[in-house]
Amino acid sequence: MNDKYSTTEGKTSEKLSDEAMLSAQWKNIDWHKAEREVNRLQIRIVKATQQKDYNAVKRLQYLLTHSFYAKALAVKRVVTNDGRRTPGVDGVLWNTPAKKMAAALSLTDKRYRARPLRRVYIEKKDKKKKRPLGIPTMYDRAMQALYALALEPVAETTADGKSFGFRKGRCAQDACEYLFNALSRKHISPKWVLEGDIKGCFDHISHDWLLANIPMDKNILKQFLKAGFIYQRELFPTEEGTPQGGIISPILANMTLDGIEKKLVERFHTNALGKVDSRFKNAHKVNFVRYADDFVVTAATPELALEAKELIREFLAERGLELSDEKTVVTNIDDGFDFLGWNFRKYNEKLIIKPSQKAVKAIVSNISDTILRRGKAWQQDVLIMKLNEQIRGWTNYHQSVCASDAFAHLDYVLYELLWRWAKRRHPKKNKCWISTKYWHRVGNRNWVFSTENKELIRVDSTAIVRHTKIKATANPFLDVAYFQKRKFDKGMHRLTGKFKTIWKNQNGLCYHCGMPMDVTEEREIFYLAPKAKTGTEDVRNMRYVHCACQRIYAENRLKK
């Protein structure tokens, strides 16, 4: 009995020792060096792709996917994103430094078998329908993140120039600017627009096409594609489409749709010698802009727009995809069309881009839900914090278009909803009492919904700032300084007051990792000395950090 106890005690001690060692190794990873080493290989993959040396691409991808630093970065991505607390079918979470290090050491392509996805259903934006979502295991997510590091340099190099969705350094505002350039000139710009809608793009891409055309390890890709999913304890196979909820899925979808622009250029912009001819380009006025699976084609006549539609239909059919005839329509620019949450329409030959009615209704619905349902019992400062998050996100997205009227309307809606919220809380109090309790004078502004510490953002105070479109040929792996400057400039445009000062002082770099930050992505303020001790928000004590970096920093301090 004593011998058995001693053996168990020894194994426990050994396990604790191993965990301590793995934990220390994870905490001591040099993330700067990891980024540099992986980026060095990615640059070589880009150059090999440009030279069409696909044997070199394959060799370099192998080196990258077998690199410890790439594996560590893949695990880091999985354990710091929003789904880090959501397990797959195996119920496993990597929630300690030791588990993360063990995971990084265990990633391998040898005998790799992807586990089925866990199927859940989440509400769509209209809340009337639900859409399926597949949740891979942590291990499968990390494998996808690892192979995405090797595939993305190829995807960025071969991508259509006017493709802007799910790509590094590109955004919906870039797509908007390119459409503005194509449609804004008086009496010269194209009059007709083909609004494209692909039926269930991510769900129906042909596996045969992907396996034949995507330049990556075919066995690994097949595992990603054929994993299947489990719903209500029953296993279902996947015969088409990209992995739902998968990290690599947007890259696969983009690579599937890349080539539409080239096909349109060959048909409408080139002469009999196969060279781009400005005469054809100016006569046909065919332009193409795509964001993920949403696209727009401009044309001089409705007949040319319909011809473009047929070319795209043929292109998609080879990939197992088809257009929705009901939603793929040809529209005159004077009647207007919606794209990416904006309405594009000409009024007396002047192009106006503004938030679409659907986008305005959506934000009003979300704010109403926050105030009257979720926030009915919240304290005022909590409600202000939640509303400010929603308002900032919406105004940041729309501040590069003609949004002043929409912003003013949103201010009016906010006031009406907040007054209803206050009346519900104090049904026996009069208007004067309610207004005195919740609305105050702040600086030169009257009637500000505020507390001692927080105040509600005034929506129409958001400055309208024209977005600077990206160079269509820019590559994020080669033009590093260009992309870093764009990120910094975006922060300088979006931020105000002390937050702009902090951003400027740090040159837009994360205080923890030293890597560039994107002002539109997750970031937070880190206090050098705890705010509880200083009691003030002095910019000298404040630094911007990535949320993911702050989580790692806090975790490492906690485990010490």
Question: What residue spans do the PLM features occupy?
Answer:
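Extended C-terminal regions of large enzymes
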Residues: 411-495
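Right-hand nucleic-acid polymerase module
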Residues: 1-2, 370-429
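Histidine-centered nuclease catalytic patch
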Residues: 514-547, 551-553, 557-558
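Conserved polymerase palm-domain catalytic core
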Residues: 106, 110, 158-162, 167, ...
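A conserved non-catalytic segment of reverse transcriptases
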Residues: 226, 232-235, 319-383, 389-392
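Charged boundary/loop elements
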Residues: 24-83, 149-165
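Short, flexible, mixed-charge glycine/proline-rich loop motifs
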Residues: 498-506, 535-539
